[in-house]
Amino acid sequence: KRVVVTIHGIDWQREKWQSGLGSKFIHQGEKNAVKYADEVIVLSKGVQDYFKETYGRKTHFIPNGVNRPQTREANLITDKFGLKKDSYILFLGRLVPEKGIRYLVEAFKNVKTDKKLVIAGGSSDTDSFMKELKELAKGDDRILFTGFVQGQMLDELYSNAYIYTLPSDLE
């Protein structure tokens, strides 16, 4: 039988695995995947480059598909957050260090723009990183944290964003 492995990211580098043995076990699993899998699928060019440079391993880049959100006018997001079409840059995802949100906030604070930075999503493991982000964003009223969103609110955020950004370290 043939073995095909799909790699979603460089998981052993995630901050949540750095204490204890988790990182070592996951890293060993990565090495086993490289050694024993007949084919390796990766979801990003960055991970593809990592496997080529680290292991000399050829991989197949197949990004995840997405369900296109229903296009919606800015109603709920205008009422709740004062957002209008093309008035903001959107980050949406779990608020964890490896998503690169810290870099995003730091960079955005140095950009002269009338756009807002909307950070949508909930914390995954602890609230300490969320507190750190809010402290980092303090004093810049262009940066907005919505918390977890879904349904019509999610569709409106996607539909009306000027641009979407995902500054991830590992994905």
Say what each PLM segment does:
Residues 71-83:
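A short helix/loop element that forms part of the nucleotide-sugar donor recognition site in Leloir-type
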Residues 148-149, 156-161:
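Short alpha-helical donor nucleotide-sugar binding micro-motif in glycosyltransferases
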Residues 38, 159-171:
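Acidic donor-binding loop of glycosyltransferase active sites
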Residues 130-152:
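Nucleotide-activated donor-binding/catalytic signature segment of Leloir-type glycosyltransferases, i.e.
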Residues 46, 65:
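Carbohydrate-associated surface elements
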Residues 87, 91, 96-110, 128-131:
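A conserved mid-protein helix/loop that constitutes part of the nucleotide-sugar donor-binding site
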Residues 22-40:
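Membrane-proximal helix-turn-helix segments that form the acceptor-binding/catalytic region
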